[in-house]
Amino acid sequence: MSHHRSAFFISDRTGITAESLGHTLLTQFDALDFQRETVPFVDTVEKARALAERISEIAERDHLRPLVFTSIVNPEVREALRLNNVVLIDFFESFIGHLEIELGQKATLTVGKAHGMVNEEKYDHRIEAVNFSLNHDDGVKLKDLHEADVILVGVSRSGKTPTCLYLALQYGIRAANYPLTPEDLGSPTLPKMLLPFKDKMFGLTIDPNRLHHIRSERRPDSKYASMDNCRREVNEAESMFRHHGVPFISTTHKSIEEIASTIMHKAALGRKF
């Protein structure tokens, strides 16, 4: 039996939904190697037929049915992708009918509602949150910190910046971050500029070995990246968090998505759009 399988994530818009749901399912099959391809903006029957022809050729080449995950609103476009030599997993067809029955209402079947700019006010809020996080990255801008929903604090390279941007983009959270420097860590006292915002602080920590590896790629053979320094910084940062009752989590074995979701839950933050 071949351990190689083609998988397509097809959508009439960005492809984010089909890709995310399909990828989640495929991660449960570790022994298989999936050749993944995302195909967005398949919004006409003509486009669907052309794509179906290409997928059919791949099925003949591989002697295996490709896996086709779709999140397409238009039933005619969906039908054009229904082939005998593919496994079609249609997220819309699988769930929308059950919801219509339960809710007693027909779905509007409007393309682009999940990831399109349907509501300008919500979209603007999302962009404002991203700009806020960019402007308040790495402690560069300390003004307006009172407008932050959360302030991530941690040693350098503990995952603060990508987490802030993900919180802004995915949840509309105004997330600032502040890097704990050696000067900050010399005392258990919180950095002076953060004292008024203690209730908004959330700490990120990381395993010293992992931190050493990350820093060594950036600045090899430096004191900054040395194992002793990484261990000291992490220990002092965690002591500071505990001393002041600042909640914190380890980012060592977590993805950005997991870190952000954990912060949303533990800090009792709500989605802003």
From Swiss-Prot:
Q: In the Enzyme Commission scheme, what number(s) does this protein have?
A: 2.7.11.33, 2.7.4.28
Ranges in a coiled coil: none
- InterPro entries (alphabetical): Kinase-pyrophosphorylase (IPR005177), PSRP (IPR026530)
A Pfam family (short name) is: Kinase-PPPase
Reaction(s) catalysed by this chain, per the record, are: [pyruvate, water dikinase] + ADP = [pyruvate, water dikinase]-phosphate + AMP + H(+); [pyruvate, water dikinase]-phosphate + phosphate + H(+) = [pyruvate, water dikinase] + diphosphate
Disulfide-bonded cysteines: none
Could you confirm whether the keyword Nucleotide-binding appears in this record? yes
Q: Which residues bind ADP?
A: G154, V155, S156, R157, S158, G159, K160, T161
Which of the seven top EC classes does this enzyme belong to? transferase
GO molecular function, a single term: ADP binding
Recite the UniProt keywords alphabetically: Kinase, Nucleotide-binding, Serine/threonine-protein kinase, Transferase
Protein task: Bifunctional serine/threonine kinase and phosphorylase involved in the regulation of the phosphoenolpyruvate synthase (PEPS) by catalyzing its phosphorylation/dephosphorylation.
**Family membership:** Belongs to the pyruvate, phosphate/water dikinase regulatory protein family. PSRP subfamily.
- Record-given protein name: Putative phosphoenolpyruvate synthase regulatory protein
